[in-house]
């Protein structure tokens, strides 16, 4: 069996070497010639997998180590009898950590109390849904817009217009859909962006084209009160340099790039592959993940809650480093800038998730205990 895979997928040998030969390619370089003799194709979001890539090939299973599937032509897969799997939720926790880190940075810049903000989450799937649970757990006011879930479940969802009118912070977590009943391409267009509240914060860690980047650039030029945090870009790896300069935080599509999330994505497509072949799983992710480099953090019961929140979140992730690295990589030379974008992702430093963090409390502190629980960290006793 020949397995063609994106070279940046972690643990390929650990999970797939037992099935046959693995050939690795840069994700953007996987083409019809490299896929022609493959039985299995393993990709990330940078590889468009469609008829043009696979027609005439031997590929019968496609796995993408991502939550999103907008780079896969699922209609063609159905017609061609190609089995496929994505990795829903694999990096959800990493994205939540990214959003929390961004909120802390913006709060420091603006001198605002995060407890007093109103949060709007657009898209409440694996990522957005987890973010909503964390924000609710912290006791913050959250409004949620998800027309797909609203139609199937009912519940306390609101319209996008309500989010724009009432929320100080808007975090986008939708898939990219160009058509259908609920398209998300340019969900925030010029008109929608113009209705942002004074002093609004906009975070996009979903897909670049969910926001009209040209319209956002023009808005930020006109309104200094609005802060934008962009991890995803229209046309990436090429980036609108002026827009990046106008963003308060700008990063190269790494919001979900925790070590745990990336390895979890590989594990999920391995599990789907085993189910497709009707074989038992021989490898477990729990046996491969390294121990958390930070053993534990201890907090005094009288610690300031705002300080404690920042300490815990930044113990695992602070977006300011990624922002600085990204800005240093930006170049007027398009080819150089595109290459730098991919290199930052390829050589991304090890980053763990807050759920692997152990936190000890010295003394009785119900508010801090609730915060630790909401963040998903492990509350442990202090001797």
Curated annotation (Swiss-Prot):
GO terms for biological process: 'de novo' pyridoxal 5'-phosphate biosynthetic process; pyridoxine biosynthetic process. Substrate binds at residues 45, 66, 257. It catalyses: 4-phospho-D-erythronate + NAD(+) = (R)-3-hydroxy-2-oxo-4-phosphooxybutanoate + NADH + H(+). Transmembrane segments: none annotated. NAD(+) binds at residues 146, 174, 205-207, 231, 256. It is found in: Cytoplasm. The keyword Cell membrane does not apply. The active site is at residues 207, 236, 253. Belongs to the D-isomer specific 2-hydroxyacid dehydrogenase family. PdxB subfamily. This is Erythronate-4-phosphate dehydrogenase.
């Amino acid at each position: 069996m020949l397995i063609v895979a994106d070279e940046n997928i972690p643990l390929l040998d650990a999970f797939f070497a037992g099935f046959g030969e693995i050939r690795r390619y840069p994700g953007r370089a996987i083409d019809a010639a490299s896929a022609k003799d493959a039985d299995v194709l393993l990709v990330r979001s940078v590889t468009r997998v469609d008829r043009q890539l696979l027609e005439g090939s031997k590929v019968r299973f496609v796995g993408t180590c991502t939550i999103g599937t907008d780079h896969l032509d699922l209609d063609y897969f159905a017609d061609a009898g190609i089995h496929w799997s994505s990795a829903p939720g694999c990096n959800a926790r990493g994205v939540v950590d990214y959003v929390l880190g961004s909120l802390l940075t913006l709060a420091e810049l603006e001198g605002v109390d995060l407890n007093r903000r109103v949060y709007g989450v657009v898209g409440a799937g694996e990522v957005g849904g987890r973010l909503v649970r964390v924000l609710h757990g912290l006791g913050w006011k959250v409004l949620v817009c998800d027309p797909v879930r609203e139609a199937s479940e009912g519940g306390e969802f609101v319209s996008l217009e309500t989010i724009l009118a009432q929320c100080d912070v808007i975090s986008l977590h939708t898939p990219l859909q160009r058509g259908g009943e609920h398209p998300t391409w340019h969900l925030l267009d010029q008109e929608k962006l113009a209705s942002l509240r004074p002093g609004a914060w906009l975070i996009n860690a979903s897909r670049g084209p969910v926001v009209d980047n040209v319209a956002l650039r023009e808005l930020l030029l006109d309104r200094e009160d609005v802060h934008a945090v962009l991890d995803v870009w229209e046309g990436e790896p090429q980036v609108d340099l002026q827009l990046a300069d106008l963003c308060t935080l700008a990063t190269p599509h790494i919001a979900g790039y925790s070590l745990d999330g990336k390895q979890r994505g590989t594990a999920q497509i391995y599990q789907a592959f085993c189910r497709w072949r009707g074989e038992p799983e021989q490898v477990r992710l729990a046996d491969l993940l390294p121990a958390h480099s930070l053993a534990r953090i201890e907090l005094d019961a009288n610690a300031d809650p705002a300080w404690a929140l920042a300490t815990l979140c930044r113990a695992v992730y602070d977006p300011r480093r990624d922002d600085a690295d990204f800005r240093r990589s930006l170049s007027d030379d398009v080819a150089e800038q595109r290459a730098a974008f991919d290199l930052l992702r390829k050589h991304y430093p090890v980053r763990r998730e807050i759920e692997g963090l152990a936190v000890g409390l010295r003394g009785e502190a119900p508010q801090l205990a609730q915060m630790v629980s909401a963040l998903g960290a492990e509350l442990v006793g202090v001797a």
